[in-house]
């Protein structure tokens, strides 16, 4: 179930997914044995949701691990709510709020994700709150925190980092403090709601050379991603590292661009 959520949540990353941490244990509803001609018999819970085996575009190279990291198990209550909803033991609407920058503001990703989650699990409310050019500090305003809290989310997803890393004077300490301010404000208003952080997809830098505008891969994205992962580890957030999954420092931007999914 965790794998399906990651797959539908991030349609831009079309690789088979696996989770770094175990799905939380819960009472078995029942078991069914599935046989396969080429694989040994294995046991499946009857509430298991199949994950479609979707591949990246053929041009994508040097892909990293596509996994969701949750070493503290903060998402366990969320997975359990999804399980109960899918099994028909709950009719409560599960509410997800996704805040971030332009790739959330574009709405295609979150709205498609919300539709697929609803088709699979039932009563899912998926609200996107993206702002073009947003930094994480864009949301460190009492009114925006109140707007998020008023939706009574079961999960909040944070997708920032692109605009922070575009600053040529990018400072890791400042970025860390800004994330800390946002997370502290969210936790003050939503103390029992898990937070999932995603890293940026990669970006290009622009500069002038011989009176012509030239583009190159932004080298600060990798530094920002490292800062975000360190912050999440230090502060108990779950992380999905999209940047690493699509190729990281060496291939992320090139993979997107060659597949005509990104341009400088």
Annotate each PLM feature:
Residues 4-10, 16-99, 103-123, 147-152:
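N-terminal secretory targeting modules
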Residues 24-26, 106-108, 165-170, 204-209, ...:
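Extracytoplasmic/secreted cell-surface and envelope-processing proteins
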Residues 68, 168-176, 214-221:
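Flexible, glycine- and charge-enriched loops at secondary-structure boundaries
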Residues 70-84, 137-150, 177-185, 222-226, ...:
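Alpha-helical scaffolding within the catalytic cores
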Residues 93-193, 204:
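Conserved SGNH/GDSL esterase-like catalytic core that processes O-acyl groups on lipids
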Residues 159, 198-199:
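Alpha/beta-hydrolase-fold catalytic nucleophile elbow
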Residues 193-196, 238:
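Proline-centered loop/turn at the N-terminus of a beta-strand
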Residues 202-264:
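Catalytic His-Asp segment of secreted/periplasmic serine-dependent ester chemistry enzymes
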């Amino acid at each position: 179930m965790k794998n399906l959520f990651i797959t539908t949540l991030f349609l831009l990353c079309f690789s088979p997914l696996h989770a770094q941490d175990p799905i939380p244990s819960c009472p078995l509803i029942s078991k069914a044995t599935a046989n396969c001609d080429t694989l040994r018999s294995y046991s499946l819970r009857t509430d298991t949701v199949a994950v479609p085996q979707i591949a990246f575009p053929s041009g994508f190279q040097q892909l990293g691990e596509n996994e969701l990291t949750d070493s503290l198990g903060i998402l366990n209550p969320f997975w359990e709510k999804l399980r109960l909803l899918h099994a028909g033991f709950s009719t409560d609407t599960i509410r997800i709020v996704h805040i971030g920058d332009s790739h959330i503001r574009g709405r295609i990703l979150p709205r498609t994700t919300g539709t697929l989650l609803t088709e699979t699990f039932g009563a899912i409310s998926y609200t996107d709150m993206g702002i073009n050019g947003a930094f994480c500090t864009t949301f460190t305003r009492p009114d925006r925190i109140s707007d998020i809290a008023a939706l009574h989310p079961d999960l909040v997803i944070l997708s920032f980092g692109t605009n922070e890393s575009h600053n040529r004077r990018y400072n890791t300490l400042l970025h860390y403090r800004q994330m800390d301010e946002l997370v502290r404000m969210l936790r003050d208003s939503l103390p029992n709601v898990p937070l999932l952080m995603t890293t940026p997809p990669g970006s290009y830098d622009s500069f002038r050379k011989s009176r012509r505008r030239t583009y190159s891969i932004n080298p600060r994205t990798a530094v920002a991603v490292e800062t975000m992962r360190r912050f999440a580890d230090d502060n108990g957030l779950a992380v999905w590292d999209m940047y690493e999954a699509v190729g990281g420092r060496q291939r992320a931007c090139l993979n997107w661009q060659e597949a005509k999914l990104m341009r400088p």
